[in-house]
Amino acid sequence: MQFSKMHGLGNDFMVVDAVTQNVFFSPELIRRLADRHLGVGFDQLLVVEPPYDPELDFHYRIFNADGSEVAQCGNGARCFARFVRLKGLTNKRDIRVSTANGRMVLTVTDDDLVRVNMGEPNFEPSAVPFRANKAEKTYIMRAAEQTILCGVVSMGNPHCVIQVDDVDTAAVETLGPVLESHERFPERANIGFMQVVKREHIRLRVFERGAGETQACGSGACAAVAVGIQQGLLAEEVRVELPGGRLDIAWKGPGHPLYMTGPAVHVYDGFIHL
């Protein structure tokens, strides 16, 4: 099987063309491939499939390193767009794809960045899903013998965002896994630790569902900005500084889609016998 290794700000992917190759990935195989000592090593596996709708260009599938399939990955979406153009699967700059959660438009810009229409953030608890009686801007949770204030949103996948004074000293390693599997998140969640530098700039670390802390999480950056705007903390255009680098997020508010812009890097091509 041929594959490419790619990354978006250090969030790394194994990307496989299932348009011209006949492939099947079991959870066991994905876990073996994800092993950084015995396999290829990656945060997520991205699979390019033929479209299910003639109006679309491709179907986009995402699997975490633990073998679970998820509906959204923003950094992966940028790498997906770069991959299908590099491999000659399309020459379009606006690439329309379906996911398990709906549809997305991926745009390769003139300066070789990728701009992703991530859709409108959904704050309804049932959409996340999150166990709550009604939608709130801020929720109170108990975890690890602490009282935690957080915002909750779906970006096609579940996110919990906590504001911290300094991301460098945030309890990502201890609080992240506890909140990820908290009983109020029946499908688990991605946990973002957000430091507001100013209204146009945040710093962010994300403990990803099924992957642990990564160098960057695109949907996590989108979620943090959406929650920050909803809570009145942030402007409509925000620079997000992650351990792996910078993303630019823009959202005009309810009724509008949120846009993420950032790089996608091809590292190498490989071949593996399954």
From Swiss-Prot:
Residues reported to bind substrate: 11, 44, 64, 74-75, 157, 190, 208-209, 218-219
One GO BP: lysine biosynthetic process via diaminopimelate
GO terms for MF: diaminopimelate epimerase activity
One Pfam family in the UniProt entry: DAP_epimerase
Catalysed reactions, as listed in the record: (2S,6S)-2,6-diaminopimelate = meso-2,6-diaminopimelate
Self-association and partners: Homodimer.
Name under which the protein is recorded: Diaminopimelate epimerase
Species for this entry: Escherichia coli O127:H6 (strain E2348/69 / EPEC)
Gene assigned in the entry: dapF
